[in-house]
Design a protein with these regions (language model features):
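Substrate-binding/charge-relay-adjacent region of secreted/lumenal peptidase catalytic domains
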Residues: 1-188
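Short acidic, Gly/Pro-enriched loop/turn segments at secondary-structure junctions
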Residues: 193-196
Length: 196
């Protein structure tokens, strides 16, 4: 979906961000971010071509993206957050650490961002309970500092991936960290073509 369509659909036509509304993308799972791809996307979307202000943890490389799946998630996240809020300084932070460790590291920075978007997740039942508790504690610490956390409900929502091929195998298996009470859980947007 084009950024302008999202702006119109959610009535965000005037939202452009500002220098004080910092934002961060959580990168993981061996996904690469391509600054050149971001610039191309911004130009395509008629958005100001503004680079990320900070790249932490590596996994930033234009040449790795010759295979789409190497960069799909990281590029999508950076493209849309920076097009929807182009004047907000944006950081890409890559780590293979658990979500709670990532939040600890961010909370220990001099000035945590105002918004963190995490489109990665893991089935809640497969994670150690200690990770949930530690994540919640770190999320509260960031919240006190003024940071809002957004987390994806995953590609399958709570139905789990078994339902992809067989709807009768639907199960209740939500994705963490969107199940934390200290994040805003974000589901998918499906819009019928006739609306536009």
């Amino acid at each position: 979906m084009e950024p302008d369509s999202l702006r119109s659909y959610y009535n965000m036509t005037g939202a452009k961000g500002s220098i004080n509304s910092t934002q961060m993308i959580f990168g993981s799972s061996n996904q690469w971010f391509s600054p050149a791809n971001l610039a191309s996307f911004q130009a395509w979307a008629y958005s100001p071509v503004i680079p990320a202000v900070a790249l932490i943890g590596g996994h930033v490389n234009d040449t790795k993206c010759y295979i789409h799946s190497f960069c799909a998630e990281a590029n999508l996240d950076m493209q849309y957050i920076m097009t929807m809020s182009p004047y907000s300084p944006t950081t890409f932070w890559y780590t293979d650490a658990w979500f709670n460790i990532f939040l600890q590291e961010v909370a220990n920075t001099a000035k945590p961002p105002k918004v963190i978007s995490m489109s990665y997740g893991a089935y809640e039942t497969g994670m150690p309970a200690g990770v949930h508790t530690s994540f919640d504690i770190e999320a509260v610490k960031l919240g006190i500092q003024g940071t809002t956390l957004f987390a994806s409900s995953g590609d399958d929502g709570v139905s789990a991936f078994f339902a992809r091929s067989d709807g009768s195998k639907c199960a209740y298996d939500p994705v963490f960290p969107c199940t934390s009470p200290y994040v805003i859980a974000v589901g998918g947007t499906i819009v019928s073509l006739w609306i536009f």
